[in-house]
């Protein structure tokens, strides 16, 4: 039986806004591209080019867990849910799933292994990281057009100085994760 390996990673877990995304990638052939590395280490324009290359040379799926799911289940469980959805969307069933980190969703009839810093060690996980990041960044750019003051197109919703300053000045939006410490803290200060 041919070994079919899927790499899985999530993005947006530490963001203060919006959904968390996950991708699953199975390469069609053995790819040794040196540019497929952890998405956080690649400049945005290059990441978009590499994402297209990955999509052309792999079987892939992207999924997400909504803001509501993050608030209801917590970010870890929402991330695992997004990963499971991405895996289930793959057109081919892998017999080995490699997941970045130390937690994995429950997947039936398949060997699942977690790999700490997998996005730096395993090409399939790096590829999943790249396509998930490009996809989520597109959403952040779109959302940023309506909420320019928060600069989500630049910070992807993460708690940068500019983003925190904007929250303090303009308040939180319906897209902010209210259970996340910096956002929750702002809400608590407002109430007192």
Task: Describe these PLM feature segments.
Residues 1-192:
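RNase H-like, Mg2+-dependent phosphodiesterase core
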């Amino acid at each position: 039986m041919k070994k079919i390996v899927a790499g899985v990673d999530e993005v947006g877990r530490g963001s203060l806004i919006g959904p968390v995304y996950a991708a699953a990638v199975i390469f069609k052939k053995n790819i040794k591209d040196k540019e497929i590395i952890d998405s956080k280490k690649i400049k945005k324009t290059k990441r978009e080019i590499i994402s297209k290359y990955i999509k052309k040379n792999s079987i892939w799926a992207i999924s997400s867990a909504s803001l509501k799911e993050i608030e209801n289940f917590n970010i870890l469980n929402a991330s695992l849910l997004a990963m499971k959805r991405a895996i289930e969307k793959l057109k081919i069933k892998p017999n080995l799933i490699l997941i970045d980190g130390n937690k994995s969703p429950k997947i039936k009839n398949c060997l699942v292994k977690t790999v700490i810093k997998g996005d730096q060690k395993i090409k399939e996980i790096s590829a999943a990281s790249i396509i998930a990041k490009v996809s989520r960044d597109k959403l952040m750019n779109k959302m940023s057009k309506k909420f320019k003051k928060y600069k989500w197109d630049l910070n992807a919703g993460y708690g940068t100085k500019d983003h925190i300053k904007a929250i303090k000045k303009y308040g939180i939006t319906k897209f902010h994760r209210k259970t996340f410490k910096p956002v929750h803290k702002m809400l608590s200060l407002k109430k007192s």
